[in-house]
Amino acid sequence: MANPIEQFKIQPLVPLKVGSVDISFTNSSAMMVLSICLITLFLTLSVRSRALVPGRWQSMAEVFYEFIAGMLRDNVGQEGRKYFPFIFSLFMFVLFGNLLGMMPIPVIGFTYTSHVIVTFAMALVVFVGVTVIGFARHGTHYLRMFFPHGAPIATAVILIPIELISYFSRPFSLAVRLFANMTVGHIILKVMGGFVVSLGAFYLIPGAVPFAFLSAITVLEFGIALLQAYVFTILSCIYLHDAIHMH
């Protein structure tokens, strides 16, 4: 059975260095480009006809549109409408990364959301963006969110450090949650796939048990791919709500 960790190895496709800095075009980069291309193609096909009675592509796009619009409306309010393009793009990028990682794509096949550096970069963009929005909207009054309104002043020495730690841990928790779930799920699939191959090669009936389990886990993993994209996006909406409304 192949090492289940090998699937997370970044492979350079176009080696390139600038001095001592490695900026090679890797399988991870290729999958990100592929995701963006497929998202663009999907949205282009969905708006091409603009029929009164929507077709399959348009219906799927409208489902995603209404889903994200509703998420923003419920968690941020009407003021969150201006941030729809970013939140929608974020959701689609995470979702396609999760789903494409499940596909047996030759040469470039890779789940970029299973690498913490990628998920942390996305989480950092959300964190910095939300912080900038908070200060742009409230100025220095944004700092008041680190000391809950109505709390006794004597508790400031305890509450402020706790709020600061909670605030600055947001990008880490956001990144690790997505990375860990995708990594663990793919490892389980790889291990169970190895059992199916090894047992199925010698015994038909014993191999059927792990195959059935693998099929169930695969279906579950597709659900988790959608769920993790949802969780990453809704937490971003909650952070955006805090920046706009200050709790």
Swiss-Prot record:
The UniProt record lists the keyword Cell inner membrane: yes
Molecular-function GO term, any one: proton-transporting ATP synthase activity, rotational mechanism
Keywords: ATP synthesis, Cell inner membrane, Cell membrane, CF(0), Hydrogen ion transport, Ion transport, Membrane, Transmembrane, Transmembrane helix, Transport
SUPFAM superfamilies linked to this entry: F1F0 ATP synthase subunit A
Keyword Membrane set for record: yes
InterPro entries linked to this entry: ATP_synth_F0_asu (IPR000568), ATP_synth_F0_asu_AS (IPR023011), ATP_synth_F0_asu_bact/mt (IPR045083), F0_ATP_A_sf (IPR035908)
Subcellular location: Cell inner membrane
Transmembrane segments: 23-43, 90-110, 116-136, 145-165, 194-214, 215-235
Record family assignment: Belongs to the ATPase A chain family.
Record HAMAP family: ATP_synth_a_bact (MF_01393)
Function: Key component of the proton channel; it plays a direct role in the translocation of protons across the membrane.
Assembly and interaction partners: F-type ATPases have 2 components, CF(1) - the catalytic core - and CF(0) - the membrane proton channel. CF(1) has five subunits: alpha(3), beta(3), gamma(1), delta(1), epsilon(1). CF(0) has three main subunits: a(1), b(2) and c(9-12). The alpha and beta chains form an alternating ring which encloses part of the gamma chain. CF(1) is attached to CF(0) by a central stalk formed by the gamma and epsilon chains, while a peripheral stalk is formed by the delta and b chains.
Name of the protein described by the UniProt record: ATP synthase subunit a
Taxonomic source organism: Paramagnetospirillum magneticum (strain ATCC 700264 / AMB-1)
Gene behind this protein: atpB
